[in-house]
Amino acid sequence: MDAIRHGLALCPEERKTNGIVAELSVRENIALALQARMGVGQFLSRAEQTALAERYVKLLGIKTETVDKPIGLLSGGNQQKAILARWMAIEPRLLILDEPTRGIDVAAKQEIMDQILRLAQGGMAVLFISSEMSEVVRVAHRIVVLRDRHKVGELPAGSSEDAVYDLIAAEHA
């Protein structure tokens, strides 16, 4: 709750265990963070939740017949888009994305990557964590390599995958 109030948002690596609430609807999952930010005693009406969810379903291309469908029945890519929508709804100052394209299909991966770029271009600070080097070099304004919680090197935007791999390998030498 404090993180939300301070403008921090996290899309976790483990979407199914730490991201979605499978039994809740797409609508409820998208509204979770905004509801939490509003605090105890204040509630989004069902109509407000529906309008919010429908806006993000359209914006992110979440494939669902209805926003009242349990999110656990959606594909992994559509679940991930709904988690991204949840955090976009609160307009965080910093969006932390931990392996946001892990385990999703190629089309959903492309859509999510495009949205991440739009968010960053719109001024949102994005911390992008990925083991997919092609994704890292595509979205990064700066690439920082960490090992055991310590910074071992940094590269500017536009660096090649080979340059990143060289930096990683240099630390193992």
Where are these regions (language model features)?
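Glycine-rich phosphate-binding loops of nucleotide-dependent enzymes
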Residues: 1-173
